[in-house]
Amino acid sequence: MNTLLIGGRGLFLNGSRLSVIGSPTPPSLPPYTIRLKFTEGVTPTFSKGTSVQVSSSPNIWDLTYENTKWGQLLSRQTGLIEVIVANTSGVVYMNYMFSGCSSLTTISLFDTSSVENMLGMFDSCSSLTTIPLFDTSSVTNISTMFNGCTGLTTVPLFNTSSVTNISVMFRNCTSLTTVPLFNTSSVTNMSTMFYGCTGLTTIPLFNTSSVTNMSNMFYGCTNVQSGALALYQQASTQATPPTSHRRAFRDCGSNTTTGAAELAQIPDDWK
């Protein structure tokens, strides 16, 4: 067992993972600082902030960026494999923060209570299988947040009460089988939300009362068994139906007996 002392706390190396000795509390970091683990031998190049290597084996780096806008801060860091800990109190923008980090597998829970924009935050993070329950109470835009996360299997029930744009959120998340019943009462745009989610088996009855755009929402979700018909019936008969809904259910459920039966009852202009 190797021991690494950082900021007065003892850390031990358990295989390839850095853990805290004697306390579940992560090591304290300066404001606007994130601790990252990269593939052995990789020397990351950062376009923003100040970086320092904490350890060479495992390959740990601290990045400090004293700014509330962290958009694209770590995008396309293909050698990044873990977010160990972060002091992100006060950060407002995290749009495309980890986009294109195709080797990222592990993310710790960090402070997102002030974040308003998570657009494309994990876009194309194809190695992610799970995600922490981030505080999304202030977020209004989560469009393309998990677009192309082909390894993602589960999603927590985020607080989406302030979200207005949820479009393309899970496009081509082919390993996703179910999703929680998010609060979508403020959402206006659901277009392409689950496009190409071939693993999806059920569709929750989302609140569509404010939605104006549902186009391509479940396009290509061929293994859906239930839920499509109920959602169509709700959306099409609400006080103000969506004005855009072309291909909302194109091929949705076409590979399953019950799904195909529901699809047959949905009008052509919705599929």
How should each PLM-predicted stretch be described?
Residues 1-31, 35:
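Glycine-biased low-complexity/repetitive sequence motifs
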Residues 22-271:
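Negatively charged
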